[in-house]
UniProtKB/Swiss-Prot annotation:
Disulfide bonds: none
Localisation per UniProt entry: Endoplasmic reticulum membrane
UniProt organism field: Aspergillus oryzae (strain ATCC 42149 / RIB 40) (Yellow koji mold)
Topology in the lipid bilayer: Single-pass membrane protein
Protein name per its UniProtKB record: Very-long-chain 3-oxoacyl-CoA reductase
Family: Belongs to the short-chain dehydrogenases/reductases (SDR) family.
Pfam families: adh_short (PF00106)
Catalytic residues identified in the record: Y220, K224
Main subcellular location of this protein, as a coarse class: endoplasmic reticulum
Length: 346
C-alpha cells in the first residue's frame, strides 16, 4: 500500500483538484495500466523465445506434394544457392533463375548429382534490364509446372555505403528495378497458379534496412521498406486462397553482397540462416509486431525484437547510430580502394 500512497500523493501534488476518493481510484487505474503494459511486454517476449527456440514451423510438404517445384530467383550464389540446395534436399524440383548461365549450370549439376530424383530447370536473366522478353520466358517455363514455393531472393545493394546525393543514377535505378520490380513481376507470374491450386509459399528476402532507416544506404533501405509493406499487403490478400506469404527480416549474413566472410553469433553463414528460415515457416520469430513477417534466425530475432518492440525503429538515436556505423564502413572501403589503386600504379 505504500506504493499506492505514493501515487495518491503524486496525484495530489499535480493539483488536479480530485477528491481524495477519486485520487485513490486514479492511482489504482495507473497501477493497473502499468502492470498490464509490463505483463503484455513480458508475454510478447515469451512468445518470441518460444517461436525462436521451441516451436516448429509448418512442414514444407504442406505447400506441395512430391514432384512439385520451387522457383528461386538470384539462385546462383549465397542465400539463393543455399535455398536451392536445401529445397532440393527436401524433395522439391528446382527452377533456378539468375543472371549468369554458367553459374546456373554448375549449380544445376551439383543438385542433380546430390539428389538424383530432383529435376532442375534454369533461366538466365538479368533483372536489372527489366526486359518483357525475359519475363515471357519465365512465364512459359512456370506455367507448365506445379510451383509450390517461390523464393524472391534476387537483390542488389550499394557497392559501398554512399550518401544519397552521391549515389549514381545507374546504381539507384538498378537497386529499385531489381529489388522492387523484379520481385513484383516474378511473383505476379507465379501467384495465379498457386491461387488455382489453393496452396503455396512465397518467401521474400527482406532486411533490417527495411526496418531501420539506414543513412548512406538510403535507396536500398527504401526498397526493402517497400517490400515490407508490399509483402504484408500481399499476405493478407492471398491468405484466403491458402497461400502463405512471408517476408524474412535479416541482419547481416556472410555473402558477396555483405562483403563479410567470417561467420559469428550475429552473422550466420547462408546454410545456417536458410535452415532456420525453412524450419520456422509461419512463426514470427523476433518480429511479433509485423504480420506476415519473420526474423527466424535466433540472434537476428532477438535483435529485431529489441529494435522494434523496445528501442523503436524510427528513433533519432537509433538512426544516428546506424549512420555512424555505415560512415565507418564507407571510410574503410574508401581507404581500401586507395590502397588498391596505389598498388596498381606502382
Amino acid at each position: 500500500m505504500d506504493f499506492l500512497s505514493k501515487h495518491t500523493t503524486c496525484l495530489s501534488n499535480l493539483e488536479l483538484n480530485l477528491a481524495p476518493g477519486w485520487q485513490t481510484v486514479s492511482a489504482y487505474f495507473l497501477l493497473a495500466a502499468g502492470s498490464l503494459f509490463v505483463a503484455s511486454r513480458a508475454l510478447t517476449f515469451v512468445r518470441v523465445l518460444l517461436s525462436l527456440f521451441v516451436l516448429p514451423g509448418k512442414s514444407l510438404r504442406s505447400f506441395g506434394p512430391k514432384g512439385s517445384w520451387a522457383v528461386v530467383t538470384g539462385a546462383s550464389d549465397g542465400l539463393g544457392k543455399e535455398f536451392s540446395l536445401q529445397l532440393a534436399r527436401a524433395g522439391f524440383n528446382i527452377v533456378l533463375v539468375s543472371r549468369t548461365a554458367s553459374k546456373l549450370t554448375t549449380l544445376s549439376d551439383e543438385i542433380t548429382s546430390k539428389y538424383a530424383s530432383v529435376q532442375t530447370k534454369t533461366l538466365a536473366m538479368d533483372f536489372a534490364r527489366n526486359e518483357d522478353s525475359d519475363y515471357e520466358k519465365l512465364k512459359a517455363l512456370v506455367d507448365e509446372l506445379d510451383v509450390a514455393i517461390l523464393v524472391n531472393n534476387v537483390g542488389k545493394s550499394h557497392d559501398i555505403p554512399t550518401p544519397f546525393a552521391l549515389t549514381s543514377q545507374e546504381e539507384m535505378t538498378d537497386i529499385i528495378t531489381i529489388n522492387c520490380m523484379g520481385t513484383l513481376r516474378a511473383t505476379q507470374l507465379i501467384v495465379p497458379g498457386m491461387m488455382q491450386r489453393k496452396r503455396g509459399l512465397i518467401l521474400t528476402m527482406g532486411s533490417f534496412g527495411g526496418l531501420l532507416p539506414t543513412p548512406l544506404l538510403a535507396t536500398y533501405s527504401g526498397s526493402k521498406a517497400f517490400l515490407q509493406q508490399w509483402s504484408t499487403a500481399l499476405g493478407s490478400e492471398l491468405e484466403e486462397h491458402g497461400i502463405t506469404v512471408e517476408l524474412v527480416q535479416a541482419y547481416l549474413i556472410t555473402s558477396a553482397m555483405s562483403k563479410i566472410r567470417r561467420a559469428s553469433a550475429t552473422i550466420p553463414d547462408p546454410r545456417s540462416f536458410v535452415k532456420s528460415v525453412l524450419s520456422k515457416i509461419g512463426r514470427n520469430g523476433g518480429s511479433p509486431s509485423y504480420a506476415y513477417s519473420s526474423s527466424p534466425y535466433w540472434s537476428h530475432g532477438l535483435m529485431a525484437y529489441f529494435l522494434t518492440c523496445i528501442a523503436g525503429t524510427m528513433g533519432k538515436f537509433v538512426t544516428s547510430k546506424n549512420r555512424g556505423m555505415h560512415e565507418s564502413i564507407r571510410k574503410r572501403a574508401l581507404r581500401k580502394a586507395e590502397r588498391e589503386k596505389a598498388k596498381k600504379s606502382t
